[in-house]
């Protein structure tokens, strides 16, 4: 029996869809519904591959995730990759698709955050997960 192993593209698309399906609308007053949930999703994705992420809240519900990948050369300055999980609120009536469904149409993902910046978050997360699975270390932290 053959086992399906997802490709790197499959993983990026899946992570991006998962993130798009979490409503992380930022209304500017701390009442956004899902930033903490999205951060917990990221924590789980990193923990699943043996990494030790940390979660910090700057305010209730406003969560940030930090993980450090030790580099091969500690003498080199560190490189920071970062993204944000919150999105501008979306009114469903202004959309031809559910803005929080992570729908795929004609090879494109649709949803609030698909281009700012849950797509890049998914790519970074996928690459970091792959590096952890393979035991690869970046050149620098």
Across the structure, where does each feature detected by a protein language model lie?
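Acidic/His- and Gly-rich active-site-bordering loop/insert found
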Residues: 2-115, 121, 130-140
């Amino acid at each position: 029996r053959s086992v399906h192993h997802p490709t790197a593209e499959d993983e990026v698309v899946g992570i991006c869809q998962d993130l798009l399906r979490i409503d992380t609308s930022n209304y500017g007053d701390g009442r956004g519904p899902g930033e903490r949930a999205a951060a917990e999703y990221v924590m789980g994705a990193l923990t699943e591959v043996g990494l030790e992420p940390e979660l910090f809240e700057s305010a209730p519900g406003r969560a940030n995730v930090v993980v450090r990948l030790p580099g091969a050369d500690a003498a080199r300055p560190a490189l920071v990759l970062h993204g944000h999980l919150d999105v501008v609120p979306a009114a469903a009536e202004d959309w031809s698709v559910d803005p929080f469904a992570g729908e795929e149409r004609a090879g494109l993902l649709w949803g609030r955050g698909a281009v700012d910046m849950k797509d890049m978050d998914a790519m970074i997360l996928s690459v970091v997960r792959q590096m952890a699975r393979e035991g690869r270390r970046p050149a620098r932290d």
